Design a protein with these regions (language model features):
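Canonical Radical SAM [4Fe-4S] cluster-binding loop centered on the CxxxCxxC motif
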Residues: 98-135
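Conserved AdoMet/S-adenosylmethionine-binding subsite of the radical SAM
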Residues: 144-320
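Short linear Ser/Thr-Pro motifs
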Residues: 75, 108-109, 122, 192, ...
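Conserved alpha-helical substructure of the radical SAM core
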Residues: 124-153
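Generic beta-strand structural signal
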Residues: 80, 92, 103-107, 115, ...
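P-loop NTP-binding catalytic core
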Residues: 88-102
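Auxiliary Fe-S-binding modules of radical SAM enzymes
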Residues: 1-92, 244-253, 258-345
Length: 345
């Protein structure tokens, strides 16, 4: 008997091929998919409309992604942060945020991260491995079952670079938006990237109706390379044209993420440079007051400075908003809870 497959990783088409390969009718695949991704079961024995012989086969050949909540923190504003332990013992973070329009879950896509952004806690120990499609989906299901509340929006902005785990993330998006599952529409999904240009072009060809959020954080190469080593491989001269191509190909407006760092990227000169860089794109800029990270040389810009920067951008014709800060009284920085757990705090 070979290694078991994680049945949660299979898209409906892949699951159908697998079930038919077991000599079962196609409709069984749709039933099983619903058990996994709509009813959110984590045991084959819970699939009460399936033949016992098939369940025995599945039990023998397959597993179901079912992370365990290792730590749970709840903020005064209702934000819930989870440290989830995977089947192999690795841990990831997932955050549920409550808004007036519904609940958003921020998912991780890798265990650790290889991108090395210097203001981010999740990259400090490097990348361990990619998450599978089913493991990413299970983050949402775990939060939904824990709170008893429906999740309506997803942001792929947790630990890891989604486009560095491209194929698994594409399968996850297909699973999560499938009408036979939790059926979260693409327009309710945001995917964040630090700027892997070839993968942005590959994503554009898929014409998905999600929102692409590009972690920009600086409007010139010198500053950006100091904050984000990925800029050495894909400088702004490559990244911004890729963003323009993406908008043209998909018809979807890009959002630029801009973490405000005191004395680094928060001056009026930087606002002018940023406006010039993205001129004519009609893009949205999301200004983010950074969370403090142990061991990082960076500190957050004060609120007055953030709002001054926002007003300067708007005066220059750039649509800019300040991200609402949630979970500030818990280990809110991405990767911080996982790091604290590893250090035994």
């Amino acid at each position: 008997m070979g290694e078991k497959i994680c049945i949660s990783d299979l898209t409906l088409d892949a699951l159908t091929a697998y079930i038919v390969g077991l000599g079962q009718p196609k409709f069984r695949a749709k039933q099983i998919f619903k058990w996994l991704h709509q009813k959110l079961v984590t045991e084959f024995s819970q699939m009460t409309d399936q033949p016992k012989a098939l369940l025995a086969q599945l039990e023998e050949q397959c597993t179901i992604a079912a992370p365990v909540i290792r730590r749970r923190q709840q903020s005064r504003d209702g934000t819930v942060k989870y440290l989830l332990q995977l089947a192999d013992g690795n841990c990831i973070e997932t955050v549920l945020m409550r808004y007036k329009y519904g609940n958003t879950v921020c998912v991780s896509t890798q265990v650790g991260c290889a991108m090395g952004c210097r203001f981010c806690a999740s990259t400090q120990a490097g990348r361990v491995r990619d998450l599978t499609a089913g493991e990413i989906a299970a983050e949402i299901y775990t939060a939904q079952k824990d709170t008893g509340e429906r999740v309506s929006h997803i942001v792929l902005m947790g630990i890891g670079e989604p486009l560095h785990n491209f194929n698994n993330v594409m399968d996850f998006l297909e699973i999560i938006s499938c009408s036979e599952g939790v059926n979260i529409g693409m327009r309710n999904i945001s995917l964040s990237t630090c700027g892997l240009v070839p993968k942005i072009d590959e994503l554009a060809k898929r014409h998905l109706q999600l929102t692409l959020s590009v972690s920009l954080h600086a409007p010139d190469n010198k500053t950006r390379s100091g904050m984000m080593p990925v800029n050495d491989a894909f400088p702004l001269e490559q990244l911004i044209p890729a963003c323009r191509r993406y908008q043209k190909e998909t018809g979807r407006r890009i959002s630029f993420e801009y973490s405000m760092v005191r004395g680094v990227n928060d001056s009026s000169e930087m606002a002018q440079k940023l406006a010039n860089l993205i001129k004519g794109m009609g893009a949205h800029v999301n200004l983010i007051p950074i969370n403090p990270v142990d061991g990082s040389p960076y500190s957050a810009t004060d609120d007055a400075n953030v709002h001054r920067f926002q007003k300067e951008l708007e005066a220059l014709g750039v649509n800019a908003t300040v991200r609402r800060r949630l979970g500030t009284d818990i280990s809110a920085a991405c990767g911080q809870l996982r790091r604290e757990d590893a250090q035994g705090k």
